[in-house]
Amino acid sequence: MDDQADAEMGEEAEMPEGEAPLEPPAPQPISDADPDYKVHTTEFDEEIPAEELAEPVELERLRAYLDQQLEPLKGAVSRLANKLQRRLQAQQNRSWEFDREEGILDAGRLARIVASPTTPLSFKVEKDTDFRDTVVTLLLDNSGSMRGRPISIAAICADVMARTLERCDVKVEILGFTTKAWKGGQSREKWLAEGRVATPGRLNDLRHIIYKSADAPWRRTRPNLGLMMKEGLLKENIDGEALEWAHRRMVMRPEQRKVLMVISDGAPVDDSTLSVNPANYLEKHLRDVIAMVEKRKAVELVAIGIGHDVTRYYQRAVTITDAEQLAGAITEQLASLFDLKGANGPRMALRRTG
């Protein structure tokens, strides 16, 4: 009992009479890129694997539909993917460590042993190149304006890229972003119930979709890409927060080189948010996030615009105008992306297409 009484007295001594308790710490900003970027509530936001948004049977059916869309291009896409694979693998320049005690016998140094029989055998070991220590994230705009041919293009693009890069030992992550509802969803309902505070910031429920994590094999996640064909999935696009989410996921990865590729068809739009905030609210945040990612240089950022000029946002950008151009364009861009021949190591050499 005495010990308990002492403990209670100690607690009282720590809080002198008349002093107010300490204020709780200020909440962390929603965005690393802009501490003034506001979100009315994150309560209804969702980060979800694609397989949780549809039953397996439906995913297989949707994937079959996507394959149908791809059928006219399948031969050309496969040929270009194989060509890209050969080019990438040829760029994985071999380098060796010599004079090792074990490994592959170094035939080039056998002459030394003939000249001096007491010289021990020399072995060599192949060094891993940085090329393999790479992860690529593909961030897909899943907004309503992508419905129809553009979303098929994006899904096909993701499919070809994931298969080809996986064969070259490059990890690939495929993410998508949209909202759970039109017209603000539960976030707007909560805002209305709470008295319509002025300039509430982002006012819709985010839906961030993981189609393929970097460590998951393409074969296992293949049906997930069919989800993009699902009626009612594609809604609003809040690009800045999606880009920041993808960037956060990437910087936690162990790979030395990180490439983040965004595929989009327009500027960020969310009617609920823009109706109660400045007209450029979401676009400004996207520009701020891009500036942060490009400044930090932990991740190489590149954008592909589908019928949309993304060069006004991103330093490294390319425009694709139609699916028929997609296979050739993406082959060239990926080959440039992984061009290891430059004096300064890996570099990007993107050009605008279309």
Predicted regions and their residues:
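Acidic, glycine-rich A-domain
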Residues: D3-G354
